[in-house]
Amino acid sequence: CKHDHAMTVWHYIKEHDNGITNFHFEVAADLLNEEEMELMKTMRPGLIQLEIGVQSTNLDTIREIHRTMKFEQVAEVVRRINSYGNVHQHLDLIAGLPYEDYESFGKSFDDVYALEPEQLQLGFLKVLKGSYMEERKDDYGLVYKGMPPYEVLYTKWLPYEDTLRLKGIEEMVEVYYNSRQFTNTMEELEKEYDSAFTMYDRLASYYEDNGYNAVQHKRSARYEILLNYIRLHHKEKEDLFREVLTYDYYLRENAKSRPEFAGEDATDKRFVRAFYEDCLLYTSPS
């Protein structure tokens, strides 16, 4: 790791910042040193973003793919950079690695999700010609597509059915987490489950069971589908989630009227009417 080279590059882009251009860097977070992090702290918000390839937190998997990552150190660095509030972080996981089954991938997911990155990217192993993974494919029971990008179908640890389930979770994470349109709702909904992975797994199953994956959805429809899911599984908290969803909707959308899924709000109307009546009384001539 050439720290001097990295510092030279980052100093240059900071000194020549045009206020518009964004630079994307793929880094090993556990190798960042104090000087580099202190420099990041001084950068314009949005000047740089970091992509951090965690891939897995399963120790057996990490050893098998010859990585030296120390996840505890990665987590410490990610939290610290998060606290700066000026650098977006994208953390990556890869499904289909050796010794990674559905359950252990779920743990890797929860470990990374807890770090609250701006983006959590779920990828699937690509078995490139001449790579180490191709050499060990028989040992791993690794079956993958015969055409580029040679993506994994299943392994001796991860059956094809579970690969499909992870595909569904990938879609839910893209829609309900990475879009940043449902931040407050998903934080509240997570409290209803023993893990974030379980939450996205259940939501993915709901999409699959109702045929939603085969349909193109408007953004507003995503709110309605999520509320329908909540109505089915958390009926007693429907009113709470409707309000939080409405709040998220107004935060992200340039809405001129109350969304259909929010329904009528008689309480709001009473408060508005009372407010205007008070204003009229206050401004009326004596």
Task: List the predicted regions and their residue ranges.
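Rossmann-like AdoMet/SAM-dependent catalytic core
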Residues: 159-179, 184-281
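Flexible glycine/acidic-rich beta-alpha junction loops that bind and position SAM and/or redox cofactors
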Residues: 4-5, 60-65, 97-104, 116-205
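A short alpha/beta connector and helix-capping loop motif
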Residues: 105-112
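Conserved SAM/AdoMet-binding glycine-rich loop
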Residues: 1-97
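Conserved small/polar residues in nucleotide/adenosyl-binding loops
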Residues: 282-286
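Alpha-helix boundary/capping residues
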Residues: 43-44, 112, 170-173
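Hydrophobic transmembrane alpha-helix bundles
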Residues: 25-36, 58-70, 91-97, 124-136, ...
